[in-house]
């Protein structure tokens, strides 16, 4: 098995996000109760966005993703979407191994990677057209 440092960015991000879900899993009912509270009072969630953003930046940096500049900002927003999409699967994942969560995270990361490549081409085309 490769060490985390020898893994691809995507593999490292998978490991970082799954570590987060493992932590959530240890206190599953508490986190689900907190989530249910946010559904009743969504304005409370807004107060946590700066902390969540910071935690996403740290997660990205642990996975050796550059989140600086314009491209990094887009990448960070994509990572947040991946995390939230996977979080909603985790809410319904009653397996002890979190296999549904792992499959969803892998699928979401694959989609994000494809979208990122597509977006890079679009940005390149726009730059070439504007020159």
Predicted stretch roles:
Residues 32-34, 68-69:
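Short, hydrophobic secondary-structure boundary micro-motifs
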Residues 65-127:
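Hydrophobic/aromatic-rich alpha-helical bundle segments in the mid-to-C-terminal region
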Residues 18, 22, 50-53, 106, ...:
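Generic structural signal for well-ordered, non-transmembrane alpha-helical segments
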Residues 29, 124-131:
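Extended low-complexity intrinsically disordered regions
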